[in-house]
C-alpha cells in the first residue's frame, strides 16, 4: 500500500482501458477491507463501509474524504448517516476500475479516527 500513498491520481477523461479481473485482485491486496462490487450495469467499484459512534463523526469523515478527493481530482460516491459512511470508488470515465481508485482508497484508509 505504501507505494499507492506516494502516488497521485492522474486525470482520466477516457481512453484508458479499465483493469481486468486479475489486475483488480492484484491491486485489491494493497488496500485492506475494500470489497469489489458491481452495479446494475456490471461496472466494478471499490466499496467500503466505515462505522462511527454517531452522526457527527460520520459527517466529519465524509468532509475529510471530500478534501482528499478534491486534492486528488478523483471523486467517490459517498452515502452516510448515523454511525456509518459507505464509500464507493470507480473511474466513471472508463466505466471501471483504474489505479486511481486504489490510490484514493489507500489515502482514505489513512484518515485517523475522528
What are the functions of these language-model segments?
Residues 1-56, 60-114:
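Long, contiguous binding/interaction regions
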Amino acid at each position: 500500500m505504501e507505494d499507492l500513498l506516494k502516488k497521485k491520481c492522474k486525470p482520466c477523461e477516457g481512453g484508458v482501458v479499465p483493469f481486468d479481473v486479475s489486475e483488480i485482485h492484484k491491486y485489491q491486496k494493497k488496500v485492506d477491507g475494500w470489497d469489489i462490487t458491481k452495479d446494475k450495469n456490471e461496472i466494478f467499484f471499490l466499496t467500503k463501509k466505515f462505522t462511527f459512534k454517531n452522526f457527527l463523526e460520520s459527517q466529519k469523515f465524509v468532509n475529510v474524504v471530500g478534501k482528499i478527493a478534491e486534492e486528488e481530482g478523483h471523486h467517490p460516491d459517498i452515502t452516510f448517516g448515523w454511525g456509518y459512511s459507505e464509500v464507493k470508488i470507480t473511474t466513471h470515465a472508463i466505466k471501471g476500475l483504474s489505479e486511481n481508485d486504489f490510490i484514493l482508497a489507500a489515502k482514505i484508509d489513512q484518515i485517523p479516527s475522528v
